[in-house]
Each structure stands twice: as structure tokens, then as C-alpha cells.
A protein has these predicted regions:
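Active-site hotspot residues in diverse enzymes, especially metal/ion-binding acidic/histidine motifs
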Residues: 1-245
Length: 245
């Protein structure tokens, strides 16, 4: 598989970003094992209140500064609970951050981990651990609605974007009220505009508030509604022709 880094295509094993993700995946997996957590969902708030960081003999966590973390509005039903879980996951991540930096610098010849947002990357993995997501997503054919039922403490947005950390190539697009909010890929530089197939799926999901999956013109596209009375968000997972086997 190939991912894009600094504007060029590279194999996963040749990319420092891949090494970082594996390091963080392993760290979170160790944390889950020591906390005797063997299946989702992860209640980060309960872990925080239970002082779970002590299981790895880590420093007590601190509430991260706004500059150090990703602040987002999940735009979904139950947003307050999802936000609470995200903040708790970020706070837990602050206690794992030091160990992550030590491992990263050891792996890279004491090169300082400058500019890496460890807290956000770890928090995403606490709510949606890679070793679970990889097998569960494959078994569910990457169905976001079904994944949300399993990883219910994580926002749809986080679950969708975590698919980019898996081996399967795809483009994830988040559309809010008809405007592209995020469009990211693990296999290419995604076109700024939607393909005809993506646009067709988006229009159907937006108008009907129902999931849609289409294979047309070489594109494989699945779309899901995350709709509220005053806000319409759609999330697409697309596989472009050049990324298919």
C-alpha cells in the first residue's frame, strides 16, 4: 500500500509517519491490556475518574491547553456526551504523551519530536483503538453507522478519519450543509471537488437521510447521514479507481 507524504507517494514502511502510528498503536494497546479492556466501547471518562494512568505508572494527567489539542464540534445527536469523552481521552493522552515522546526519540536517534500532536493522535486511539478497528471495520465492510454502534463513545468524525490509519486506501470527506468541511486521503492527494459518483451519493444521502453505497465509473463510494434538525452533515468513504486492486 502507498500513502502520501510531503506530496510524494511512498510505501508505508518507508514513511516516518507510519512508524509513529505503529508506536502509538502499540502504546495504546499496552494501556488497554493493563486496564483489562478487551472490547469497545471505551469509556474514557470512567478511565480518567478511575485514575487508569496509574496502571502504566505514568504521571497524573493534566487538562491540555487549547493550543495543544484538537477542538471540534461533532455535529451529532448526543454531542455533549461525545465531547465529554473526547476531552477525557485528551486528558488521558496527556499522561501517555511523555512515554510516546521517549519512544519516538529512541526510535529516531534522539531526534526531538517537534511539531507532533501526540495528544490528539493518542486520544483518537484511546476511543478507537487500531487493533480493534482494523478487524471490526473489515468485518463490517467499513460501515460507519455500524462502527458507531460499536465505538459509541467516539464521534462519527473521529471514527471516519481513523479509517485513514488502516491499510485500505480511501478518501474520507465530511460535508456540512452542502459545503466540504474536510477531505483527506491515505492513498493520494484528493481532488478538491467531488467526483460524479461521490456527488451522486452525497445528494442522495443529503436528501433522503439514508446511507448509500455505489460502484460507478470506477469509483466505490459509501455515504452516511449525520443529520440533526438544524444541521446536515454527510460523511463519504471513497475508493478512487487508481487505488483499487
Amino acid at each position: 500500500m502507498y500513502i502520501y507524504a510531503n506530496g510524494r507517494s511512498t510505501t508505508l514502511n518507508d514513511n516516518p509517519l507510519y512508524d509513529l502510528h505503529v508506536l502509538l498503536d502499540n502504546l495504546v494497546q499496552e494501556f488497554m491490556a493493563k486496564a483489562s479492556l478487551h472490547q469497545p466501547p471505551i469509556d474514557a471518562d470512567a478511565l480518567l475518574n478511575g485514575k487508569a494512568w496509574q496502571l502504566l505508572e505514568l504521571e497524573a494527567p493534566s487538562i491540555p491547553s487549547k493550543k495543544a489539542v484538537q477542538v471540534f464540534d461533532p455535529k451529532e445527536a448526543g454531542s455533549s456526551d461525545v465531547k465529554k469523552q473526547w476531552l477525557a481521552a485528551q486528558t488521558l493522552a496527556s499522561s501517555l504523551q511523555k512515554e510516546a515522546k521517549i519512544r519516538w526519540e529512541k526510535l529516531n536517534g534522539n531526534q526531538t519530536a517537534f511539531g507532533i500532536s501526540f495528544i490528539n493522535l493518542i486520544a483518537q486511539r484511546i476511543l478507537v483503538p487500531t487493533h480493534w478497528l482494523k478487524s471490526i471495520a473489515l468485518s463490517l465492510d467499513y460501515d460507519l453507522i455500524e462502527l458507531k454502534r460499536i465505538f459509541k463513545t467516539a464521534a462519527y468524525e473521529i471514527i471516519a478519519l481513523r479509517m485513514l490509519d488502516l491499510d485500505n486506501p480511501c478518501i474520507i470527506t465530511i460535508v456540512d450543509n452542502g459545503h466540504i468541511f474536510k477531505r483527506k486521503s491515505n492513498c493520494c492527494i484528493p481532488p478538491k471537488t467531488l467526483s460524479d459518483t461521490e456527488a451522486m451519493v452525497l445528494n442522495y444521502v443529503h436528501e433522503n437521510s439514508r446511507p448509500k453505497k455505489v460502484n460507478d465509473q470506477g469509483w466505490q463510494v459509501a455515504g452516511w447521514p449525520v443529520h440533526q434538525l438544524d444541521w446536515r452533515r454527510e460523511i463519504l468513504r471513497s475508493i478512487p479507481p487508481e487505488s483499487q486492486d
